[in-house]
Amino acid sequence: SDEETALLTPFEDPKEAAEYLLGTGVRLVAVTLGSEGVLICSRDGSRKVSGFVSHVVDTTGAGDSFWGAFVSQLIRADKSLEEFSIDELEEFARYGNAVASLCVEKRGGLRSIPEESETFERLAVK
């Protein structure tokens, strides 16, 4: 997350931190930015992927739900990290953002994780 970039790198700015990490050999960097979305960086480029508008009830599980959704898309694509274009990574990040935006609209952790059909509905809004 943007709060942790200073712990992992000499930089507080998410973009600078991501570029630093790529320079160390990391192949994919995703810095979550709370309600603002996520910054995705790879050797193919970088993108800030906006979050979705949601009625926030409880932020419990938002980060975990983003990461679960994002990583699930990487796994489903069945490619190595180097093969993903920045456009593909942006779509995976949008999916993760959609899941997280739905998660914060309900109370609790596990019960707030949306069904995939709800996620597709949210993706269609934007």
Regions found by a protein language model. Give the residues of each.
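Active-site rim beta-loop-alpha module in soluble metabolic enzymes
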Residues: 4
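Residue-level signal for inorganic ion chemistry
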Residues: 1
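Conserved phosphate-binding/catalytic region of the ribokinase-like
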Residues: 10-126
